[in-house]
């Protein structure tokens, strides 16, 4: 009898007779046609004389269930221990592999010694047919024993497993929620040459489709996180194309992947490979800057732009480029967009002083007033459903600077700028207070400019221009040797 035969047959293992139904479930409570069905025999882990499941149990017993509500209790059956060799000799390896309890038994008892004959026989059985191997990879339970094979495989066994994956349809495995685990583990455990061959095969697939699939994207993420950058340069080149970048960034899964690629390319500038990585990063960021306006207005792609703006280190130069080349001169229109307004908020928060000054001045005086309504940009944003959040961010930035909550200490001259911006917004808010009070957002804006503890412009101006006595004291502190003469 072939070991993977799908039929209702009676098996005998070490004196215990039990049935297998067509779904291969060792725990099946199959209903028999006869009136007095024989209770099915179940495979249970045996530990310290009890039938409790344990991850470290390596002994299994056959035990019969009650199966009947009769008052008469059947005589207890003595436990019968089995081994991996017993399963192999009785041709039930596949049945165990696709059963939830059986596969745990196989995992627990798979030999660690690569020269073990039982291990070799088990490996050969699972890889004798590509159809069988792929079926196990796609199986809810079978994928666990395949992962065990991958984890402990020798280089020769790795090559065989790799051949099976490629011949059996690697792309389909990547898109399957169970088989993709096998591919991910192979990327992590295989040696360099076999991983390189696996990557070469992945590079031939439709990468845009993989990056926007909620299952196969995990394979690409594993590549980006685990492998050296020089093994997936093809993926950076793929993203550096405008159409490819837009397709991936506009997807709710793909946008996060692009952020991970940026993070990996920009990490640890002290490593020798950073020069190579910075070239790839520049290629990708050039494409992102070129498409910044479209990305900022997309539901998911805007997160990529926000991520760049909020990043530090080497990414600050790209943050400044995005603000200068993409956001400036477009602040009013982007602030009124549902998604781009988040980008503008982040830009105000993380912009360096020079660019922040340009952004503030653009909102205050960079646009011609509307002829019909006589409203300027600040008036428009105050009452806009998205733009009001940008104004709130502007007020918050000025308030934080004036009350000393900035991380860095600002010189008096810079504080004067913040004070001037704050006073302009405060006066405009108070001018429109009666209308703003009708909206919850307007009430928040009014509250933000009426906060106590924010110094007035006069106070800041006085701080910026120290008195003669203060200048003398500062001089004395700087040059104490002069006084000692």
Curated annotation (Swiss-Prot):
<feature type="repeat" description="Pumilio 1">
    <location>
        <begin position="86"/>
        <end position="124"/>
    </location>
</feature>
<feature type="repeat" description="Pumilio 4">
    <location>
        <begin position="201"/>
        <end position="236"/>
    </location>
</feature>
<feature type="repeat" description="Pumilio 3">
    <location>
        <begin position="164"/>
        <end position="200"/>
    </location>
</feature>
<keyword id="KW-0132">Cell division</keyword>
<dbReference type="GO" id="GO:0010608">
    <property type="term" value="P:post-transcriptional regulation of gene expression"/>
</dbReference>
<feature type="repeat" description="Pumilio 7">
    <location>
        <begin position="326"/>
        <end position="361"/>
    </location>
</feature>
<comment type="function">
    <text>RNA-binding protein that binds to the consensus sequence 5'-CUCUGUAUCUUGU-3' in mRNA 3'-UTRs and modulates mRNA expression and stability. Functions redundantly with puf-5 and puf-6 in oocyte formation and organization, early embryonic cell divisions, and repression of expression of glp-1 and other maternal mRNAs in late oogenesis.</text>
</comment>
<dbReference type="GO" id="GO:0051301">
    <property type="term" value="P:cell division"/>
</dbReference>
<feature type="repeat" description="Pumilio 8">
    <location>
        <begin position="370"/>
        <end position="411"/>
    </location>
</feature>
<dbReference type="GO" id="GO:0003730">
    <property type="term" value="F:mRNA 3'-UTR binding"/>
</dbReference>
<keyword id="KW-0694">RNA-binding</keyword>
<dbReference type="GO" id="GO:0048477">
    <property type="term" value="P:oogenesis"/>
</dbReference>
<dbReference type="InterPro" id="IPR001313">
    <property type="entry name" value="Pumilio_RNA-bd_rpt"/>
</dbReference>
<keyword id="KW-0131">Cell cycle</keyword>
<dbReference type="InterPro" id="IPR011989">
    <property type="entry name" value="ARM-like"/>
</dbReference>
<feature type="region of interest" description="Disordered">
    <location>
        <begin position="29"/>
        <end position="72"/>
    </location>
</feature>
<feature type="repeat" description="Pumilio 2">
    <location>
        <begin position="128"/>
        <end position="163"/>
    </location>
</feature>
<dbReference type="Pfam" id="PF00806">
    <property type="entry name" value="PUF"/>
</dbReference>
<feature type="region of interest" description="RNA-binding">
    <location>
        <begin position="439"/>
        <end position="454"/>
    </location>
</feature>
<feature type="repeat" description="Pumilio 6">
    <location>
        <begin position="287"/>
        <end position="324"/>
    </location>
</feature>
<dbReference type="GO" id="GO:0003723">
    <property type="term" value="F:RNA binding"/>
</dbReference>
<dbReference type="GO" id="GO:0005737">
    <property type="term" value="C:cytoplasm"/>
</dbReference>
<keyword id="KW-0810">Translation regulation</keyword>
<feature type="compositionally biased region" description="Polar residues">
    <location>
        <begin position="49"/>
        <end position="71"/>
    </location>
</feature>
<dbReference type="GO" id="GO:0005634">
    <property type="term" value="C:nucleus"/>
</dbReference>
<keyword id="KW-0896">Oogenesis</keyword>
<dbReference type="InterPro" id="IPR033133">
    <property type="entry name" value="PUM-HD"/>
</dbReference>
<dbReference type="GO" id="GO:0007281">
    <property type="term" value="P:germ cell development"/>
</dbReference>
<keyword id="KW-0217">Developmental protein</keyword>
<feature type="repeat" description="Pumilio 5">
    <location>
        <begin position="237"/>
        <end position="279"/>
    </location>
</feature>
<protein>
    <recommendedName>
        <fullName>Pumilio domain-containing protein 7</fullName>
    </recommendedName>
</protein>
<keyword id="KW-0221">Differentiation</keyword>
<keyword id="KW-0677">Repeat</keyword>
<dbReference type="GO" id="GO:0006417">
    <property type="term" value="P:regulation of translation"/>
</dbReference>
<dbReference type="InterPro" id="IPR016024">
    <property type="entry name" value="ARM-type_fold"/>
</dbReference>
């Amino acid at each position: 009898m072939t070991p993977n035969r799908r039929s209702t047959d009676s098996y005998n293992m070490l004196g215990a007779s039990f049935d297998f139904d067509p779904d291969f479930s060792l725990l099946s409570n199959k209903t028999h046609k006869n009136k007095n069905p024989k209770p099915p025999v179940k495979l249970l882990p045996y530990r310290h004389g009890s039938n409790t499941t344990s991850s470290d149990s390596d002994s299994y017993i056959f035990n019969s269930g009650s199966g009947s509500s009769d008052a008469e209790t059947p005589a207890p059956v003595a436990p019968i221990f089995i081994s991996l060799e017993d399963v192999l000799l009785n041709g039930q390896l596949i049945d165990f592999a696709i059963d939830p309890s059986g596969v745990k038994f196989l995992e627990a008892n798979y030999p660690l010694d690569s020269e073990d004959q039982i291990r070799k026989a088990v490996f050969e059985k699972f890889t004798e047919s590509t159809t069988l191997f792929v079926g196990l990879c796609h199986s809810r339970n079978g994928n666990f024993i395949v992962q065990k094979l991958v984890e402990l495989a020798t280089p020769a066994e790795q090559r065989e497993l790799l051949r099976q994956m490629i011949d059996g349809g690697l792309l389909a495995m990547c898109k399957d929620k169970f088989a993709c685990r096998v591919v991910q583990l192979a990327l992590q455990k295989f040696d360099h040459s076999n991983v390189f061959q696996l990557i070469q095969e992945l590079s031939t697939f439709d990468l845009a489709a993989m990056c926007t699939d909620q299952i196969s994207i995990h394979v690409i993420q594993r590549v980006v996180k685990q492998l050296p950058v020089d093994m997936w340069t093809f993926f950076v080149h793929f993203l550096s194309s405008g159409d490819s970048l837009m397709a991936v960034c506009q997807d709710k899964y793909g946008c996060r992947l692009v952020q991970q690629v940026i993070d990996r390319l920009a990490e640890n500038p002290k490593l020798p490979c950073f020069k190579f990585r910075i070239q790839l990063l520049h290629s990708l960021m050039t494409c992102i800057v070129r498409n910044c306006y479209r990305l900022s207005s997309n539901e998911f792609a805007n997160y990529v732009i926000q991520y760049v703006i909020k990043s530090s280190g080497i990414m600050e130069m790209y943050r400044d480029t995005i603000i200068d080349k993409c956001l400036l001169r477009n602040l009013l229109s982007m602030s009124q967009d549902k998604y781009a307004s988040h980008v503008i908020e982040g830009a105000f928060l993380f912009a360096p002083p020079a660019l922040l000054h340009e952004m503030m001045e653009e909102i205050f005086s960079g646009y011609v007033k509307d002829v019909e309504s006589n409203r300027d940009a600040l008036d428009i944003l105050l009452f806009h459903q998205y733009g009001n959040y940008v104004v709130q961010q502007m007020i918050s930035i000025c308030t934080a600077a004036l009350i000393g909550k900035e991380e860095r200490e600002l010189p008096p001259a810079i504080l004067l700028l913040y004070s001037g911006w704050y006073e302009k917004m405060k006066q405009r808010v108070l001018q429109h207070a009666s209308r703003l009070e009708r909206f919850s957002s307007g009430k928040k804006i009014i509250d933000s400019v009426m906060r106590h503890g924010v110094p007035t412009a006069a106070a800041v101006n006085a701080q910026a221009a120290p008195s003669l006595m203060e200048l003398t004291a500062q001089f004395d502190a700087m040059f104490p040797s002069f006084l000692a003469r």
